[in-house]
Amino acid sequence: MSAAELAIEAHGLTRRFGNVVAVDDIALSIPRGRIYGFLGPNGSGKSTTIRMLCGLIKPSSGTIRVLGLEMPRQVEALRRRVGYMTQRFSLWEDLSARENLAFMASIYTLEARHAAQRIAAAIAEYRLQEFLDRPAGTLSGGQKQRLALAAATLHEPQLLLLDEPTSAVDPQSRRDFWESLFALTAGGTTILVSTHYMDEAERCHGLAILDLGRIVASGTPTQLMQDLPLQVVEIEAADPTAVRAALRGLASLRSLAQLGLRLHALLAPPAAQAGSPTGALPGGQGEGDGVEQVRALLARAGIVATVRKAPPSLEDVFVGATLSAGATPH
């Protein structure tokens, strides 16, 4: 992909705060007109990376180009072309929704007639009429979110940076918010959004999973699920606690989660176990298909259960990518 087709390009991007490495040698190539997601736990480097990309903080090392501009050297030229929305509501709570939009239009130095047109369009697009003259501080989480998105897009930015924008809203508001994002990309806007919600990550055209400041997996959500290097096995039994205790003896087990009466297990595949005793069942069972391993182990323990392969989910990808080597299954 050529540089002209990329909205964001970064190489060797690193940020240190004293002895702490918050972002560690990240590389990014994000195409224009797409929604790209950062998925990761708190402290994984998502927010720090976004702040470097928009010029709010300088990298310790590495190179960044955003919309063809070199960061942070050309940050002033970038400001009018980028919208930024933080997790915390950052508009003025003592001003009404209408006054906030007018104030943001002045910050973006929009000409008066154009500002009036853009404000009217934002009011209609994001359904702000019902609370237009109420102080922003009195609005619900979903209403604040709609107002913040309207303000962030008032100047029609080419790139929209969203740092966990849906963390304080209800599921319906989140769903509506994402419909608005797809409408923006249909108009040519590129969007980079950080999240810790799996369903939101699945909506992205492309995705990077971050952990401890590094990108540990990247690709489309479908590709990441298809390429998961772990076997997914589901076990259903009357006594999940007994199953959990029995599976503790399976050295190939990488993760175990309970869903009602079902247990959802991630196992290292036979190829990853070759030449290593980690895939062997207690008592010398040896390697093999994950389903057969689990069935044999439960049979030896006298546990009646239904065991089957399951398709991987994005949560499985996330767990597999962020699970450190030798971590205790959970």
State where each predicted segment sits.
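Conserved ABC transporter NBD signature motif
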Residues: 62-73, 77-78
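Conserved ABC ATPase signature
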Residues: 94, 135-139
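Conserved ABC ATPase "signature" region
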Residues: 102, 106, 113-131
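Conserved catalytic motifs of ABC-family nucleotide-binding domains
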Residues: 156
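Catalytic Walker B motif of ABC-type/P-loop ATPase nucleotide-binding domains
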Residues: 160-163
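Short, charged/small-residue-rich alpha-helical element at the C-terminal edge
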Residues: 229-324, 330
